[in-house]
Amino acid sequence: MSDTATLPTWENLVKKQLKTEDIYPILEKENLERIEVRPFYTDVQKPLANLPKVEESTHLVAKYHESLEDEVFAFMLDQNVENLDEKTFFVNNKDLAGHISPREEDQYFSLIDVFNEKEGSIDDQLAKELLAKGFKRSICVDISLHQNAGAAIYQQLGIALAKTKELIEAYGPEILNKLIFKIAVGGNYFFEMAKLRAFKMVFNQLSKEYNLDEVPYIFAETSFRNKAISDNENNLIRSTLELAAAMIGGADAVYTNNYLVSRSTDNSEEISFKQQIVLAYESIINVFEDASNGSYYVEDTTQQIADKSWALFVEMEDAGGYLELLKQGIVQKKIYEHAIQEQQWIEEGKIKLIGVNLYPKLDIKKSIEELYNEKEIKAVRWAEMFE
């Protein structure tokens, strides 16, 4: 159908339902990402090609526990484990990584970030040790901290590209297929889906600057930012939606952080992992290469995020690059500015957090000034203001 045939019909129907001629102020919702979201789509300006992922099906990653050895094929390791065969391991302990000798039947991935965010430097010795290990992916570019600290989506991706460029300059473009990107997925369902897709676009664009055609390896985990200590059941619902967005967005591996914020139990760890199992085996959303391809809304949002992310990356490079901007405190300040805007929206109720600022609305116990520091990139949960 053409725009002229469908849009007026839709507008007339909505006018009747809303009982007003001026429908767009009601339907258009402001967002801090400054992404234009239309209430009605009939096409997309730039149809996108299928955005591939590295793995054929998404790895469902569980924190290692002996009881899961027979059921789980991909583990998060922070301690040494013996006699596990034909498994996939994501190692997040640099001391442990130093003692691992990969075998052919196993797959090892490093989740160890070689960047020192406080000093604005790369741990060169650690990076070289990891590269010498023979892991399937040796160097982790971690932007989960930035999401949990309150960075905008386009800031997260721009920073990921800027960190990647620093690694290329240090170790050459051949490092691109040795990288794994650790990305935290928040609660803005379609935006987060588009975030992963947009990153595939801009990373591939960066690789082509070096005559390569690389696809990023994405390790997606659930966010801490929208979780609350006293709201466990809602945490569980939120993280399930985040996992779904990650799988549909094309993550190569997913991991569920414990839905209990202040503590961890064997039962909570098991339930957190089984969220992935339900989505994968009942909804079967972990096997599609680009499940949201063809959705006008997601594709348009993907393109907007990609454009904003690339523009920020270019701006950062022109200003000296990621490490230099860290040393100047500019990265920290930009994240801080967006983070406090988000927190203000939480305080005002523009961002709804059920059980925190709505149903019921809790009393504020900490100010924004107490929670955030413009000189430091640190994770802050929205609910901390009320706890």
Language-model regions, residue ranges each:
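Mobile "lid/hinge" segments at catalytic clefts and subdomain interfaces of large enzymes
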Residues: 141-161, 248-253, 257-289, 293, ...
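Secondary-structure transition/capping motifs at alpha-helix termini
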Residues: 21, 83-86, 105-106, 133-134, ...
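Short hydrophobic/aromatic residue motifs in ordered secondary structure
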Residues: 36-37, 252, 297, 323
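Catalytic alpha/beta active-site cores
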Residues: 1-189, 264
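Generic, well-ordered alpha-helical scaffold segments in large soluble proteins
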Residues: 13, 17, 164-167, 199-206, ...
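Generic structural signal for well-ordered, non-membrane alpha-helical segments
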Residues: 3, 7, 11, 157-161, ...
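Glycine-rich anion/phosphate-binding loop at the beta-strand->alpha-helix junction
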Residues: 157-164, 179-272
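Catalytic-core signal marking the mid-to-C-terminal active-site face
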Residues: 270, 274, 280-387
